[in-house]
């Protein structure tokens, strides 16, 4: 009986330890989008052949690795969407590696749109520098949360939710976006579905959107994958 009691206590301790470790892991993922930094700086070696979740550290770095004019000028908006996203993430600012933050600038022509998209690795906060925008995100319960925002205003898009911005004004608009990830990633819904390479099967898209295959092919022609040379 004594031996049984000892074993029972051991199992109780093991259960408590497992639950404690599980709680820690849940807490970690609730508050962090990227892995925590383990050293003062880890400037990304963007040319390394080593593949890790992130980028390996460069041996030598300078102040230039922590600085960039990437978003200092408006982006060209003469395209099919009338908008341009210019990023300042770890790929432009190697010093952001392991820091869990990045920025982007988005410029919109009058009538321009940043079409529905998601950021799988980050939440986003936009600050309106010029103009006004109709913005919104859609919850997993298919509820649209939308608002018109103007110069000086901020708006938050939760991580992973589909969202958009549309300039319905008569003048250009611009925002700065902040992310809690060094590389938030972007999936544009129309481009992802109709411009993937290899292409998503026509019958899949036809049944999904309840349209015929000819319509699918017509839409795909507008989002043809870019040729790789």
From Swiss-Prot:
The organism's superkingdom is given as Eukaryota
The note on cofactor binding and number reads: Binds 1 Mn(2+) ion per monomer.
Q: Which cofactor does it need?
A: Mn(2+)
- Which region is the signal sequence? 1-32
What CDD domains is this protein classified in? cupin_OxOx (cd02241)
Q: Which residues form the Cupin type-1 domain?
A: 69-217
What family is this?
A: Belongs to the germin family.
The protein's name in its UniProt record: Nectarin-1
Q: Which organism is it from?
A: Nicotiana plumbaginifolia (Leadwort-leaved tobacco)
Supply the gene name. NEC1
